[in-house]
């Protein structure tokens, strides 16, 4: 401990010497001052992000308050994108502030994510450096190749000006880099990025507009009188641009048609296709940021179609049809919500239906997808005691490897999607096919989103279902949303001539299962007792870095399950003892699974109900 203290003391001396000699600008960075170009109307808060040190993963942020009324409190969000407290302030260093004449004013670090700038009523510029090297749509990254900015991980904000207009501008951008963001800044070609200042209505809107700067591919298409931008940061050989555009044309048309609503003129799909681990998407009101593993993409375009359909529907469900429990956004603490089963789970329900409607899934593919979700739910013992509402409330635990085990928790994505399927079928049963989930979303869009209102979590969804059907849904929500009653699948599927039947499946396993950690890497979630994995020291929490010499992604379990019994897999594993190579022989396991199959005799009425259901249509030809 003495050695560590000596190092800290040395760093303190260096920092003090730096402050004494500081002239207000580091080498290669543009100085932000209180001088304004003639005729420019300053905003209450003005952000500048210098990329001069991009190769070091450092962004230099300047915040100008042209008319500060006195001391300024600044906060850094502790969470964003994921329902996880991630303490982004840990990446900040060298916070200081200067007045109009260039003199320093004291900055006091009052809390872990809070600073107080003790400035008089004057123009003030606050500066700091922030380390950005978190990959994926839930991160922010800056390096010699590109920059991806999830602004809530980058920008301090003042509670006193958070609701006011603010501007954002890049500085010191490499000359070959372009810009495209989701909404606020738009796009800029090489050499013009620094002139592309964007203005947001408030901080919430600004951080809902992720930005990509670097060398990337950009193409666009028109559909339903809207412009869709596709921005791809990847090797040109890692994806098929024509196929990607065709998929997105189909999805966007299907969903806009299904909702009979298009609350935007322009929408941006911002993709990263990394060679390493990568999976997931982050929704925005006017776009989405999505990561899909490049090797997986080359084999099959459906992963990108699936996540794109899900994220695109979020522009309605959660971004506009929004639960009251998520408003106003509290960037400084946990937000307790029981609505994620609807906001995430039913987004998956609709996303999969839209793949059918778009002609990307056939009936069998869709039914197999639903059956796999049922199987996943039923195989998690925790479904017997954790409700789908509570799984959303407990989302903040998902960074804990034990919490993600089947014995401890279910997924609000998984059960939410299954409950969404059953809710759709129940609405159809009660109305003889004349109403459906489509009508429920139309009602919520009309009565909440378009009126600028937030729905009261599960009670709001129940009210919508009861209003469009004229029937009570109290028992459904009590038993299957708030409660843990076993889902009587065939009471619902019989309406469309189907039954959920149990079967036995065989698959190869290395003796452990994984789940994705916050960084998107596969992390060991369970280890079988007396398995070869256990004998080789694999423990819960270990990270799987490589599978057979290639970077591992979130689909390790699926990739291994497709291999033959007796095959060997070579793993690169990282744990408490460091990184090591492990070779395991696969064994075969059997488990129960569900399939959706026809009832013994499907009558024409059931067939008609099914055809409308998997298209997402009402049987009267559409929503009335």
Residue ranges with predicted function:
Residues 288-291, 295, 320-321, 332-383:
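Post-HExxH zinc-binding segment in Zn-dependent metallohydrolases
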């Amino acid at each position: 401990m003495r050695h560590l203290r000596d190092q800290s003391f040395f760093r303190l001396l260096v920092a003090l010497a730096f402050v004494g000699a500081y002239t207000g600008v580091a080498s290669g960075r543009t100085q932000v001052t209180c001088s304004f170009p003639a005729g420019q109307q300053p905003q209450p808060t003005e952000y500048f992000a210098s990329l001069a040190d991009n190769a070091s993963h450092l962004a230099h942020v300047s915040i100008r308050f042209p008319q500060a009324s006195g001391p300024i409190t600044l906060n850094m969000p502790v969470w964003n994108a994921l329902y996880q407290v991630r303490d982004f302030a840990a990446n900040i260093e060298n916070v200081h502030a200067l007045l109009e004449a260039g003199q320093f004013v004291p900055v006091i670090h009052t809390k872990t994510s809070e600073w107080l700038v003790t400035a008089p009523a004057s123009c003030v510029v606050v500066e700091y450096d922030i380390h950005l090297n978190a990959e994926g749509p839930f991160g922010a990254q800056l390096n010699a190749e590109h920059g991806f900015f999830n602004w809530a991980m980058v920008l301090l904000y003042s509670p006193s000006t958070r609701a006011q207009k603010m501007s954002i501008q890049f500085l010191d951008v490499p000359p070959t880099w372009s810009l495209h963001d989701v909404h606020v800044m738009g796009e800029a070609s090489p050499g013009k990025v620094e002139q592309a200042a964007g203005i947001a209505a408030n901080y919430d809107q600004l951080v809902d507009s992720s930005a990509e700067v670097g060398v990337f591919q950009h193409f666009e298409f028109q559909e339903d009188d809207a412009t869709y931008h596709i921005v791809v940061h990847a090797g040109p050989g890692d994806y098929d641009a024509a196929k990607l555009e065709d998929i997105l044309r189909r999805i966007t048309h299907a969903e806009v048609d299904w909702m009979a609503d298009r609350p935007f003129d322009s929408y941006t799909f911002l993709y990263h296709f990394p060679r390493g681990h990568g999976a997931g998407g982050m929704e925005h009101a006017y776009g989405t940021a999505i990561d899909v593993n490049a090797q997986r993409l080359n084999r099959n375009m459906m992963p990108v179609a699936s996540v794109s359909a899900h994220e695109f529907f979020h522009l309605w469900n959660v971004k506009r049809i929004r639960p009251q429990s998520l408003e106003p956004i509290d960037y400084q603490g946990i937000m307790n919500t029981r609505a994620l089963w609807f906001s995430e789970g039913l987004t998956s329900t609709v996303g999969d239906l839209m793949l059918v409607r778009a002609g990307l899934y056939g009936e069998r593919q869709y039914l197999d997808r639903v059956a796999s979700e049922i199987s996943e739910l039923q195989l998690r013992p925790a479904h017997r005691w954790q409700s789908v509402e509570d799984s959303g409330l407990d989302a903040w635990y998902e960074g804990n490897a034990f919490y993600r085990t089947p014995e401890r928790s279910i997924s609000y994505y998984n059960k939410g999607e299954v409950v969404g399927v059953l809710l759709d079928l129940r609405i159809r049963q009660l109305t003889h096919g004349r109403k459906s989930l489509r009508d429920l979303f139309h009602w919520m869009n009309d009565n909440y989103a378009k009126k600028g209102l937030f729905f009261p979590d599960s009670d709001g969804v129940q009210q919508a279902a009861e209003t469009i059907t004229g029937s009570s849904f109290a028992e459904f929500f009590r038993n299957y949303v708030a409660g843990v009653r076993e889902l009587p699948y065939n009471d619902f599927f019989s309406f469309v001539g189907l039954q959920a039947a149990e079967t036995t499946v065989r698959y190869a396993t290395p003796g452990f299962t994984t789940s994705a950690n916050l960084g998107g890497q596969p992390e060991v979630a369970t280890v079988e007792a007396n398995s070869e994995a256990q004998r080789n020291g694999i423990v819960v929490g270990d990270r799987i870095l490589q599978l057979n010499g290639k970077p591992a992604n979130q689909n390790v379990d699926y990739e291994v399950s497709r291999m033959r019994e007796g095959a060997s897999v070579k793993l690169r594993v990282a744990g408490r003892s460091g990184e090591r190579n492990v070779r395991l022989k696969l064994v075969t396991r059997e488990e129960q699974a569900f399939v959706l199959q026809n009832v013994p005799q499907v009558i024409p009425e059931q067939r008609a109900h099914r055809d409308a259901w998997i298209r997402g249509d009402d049987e009267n030809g559409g929503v009335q």
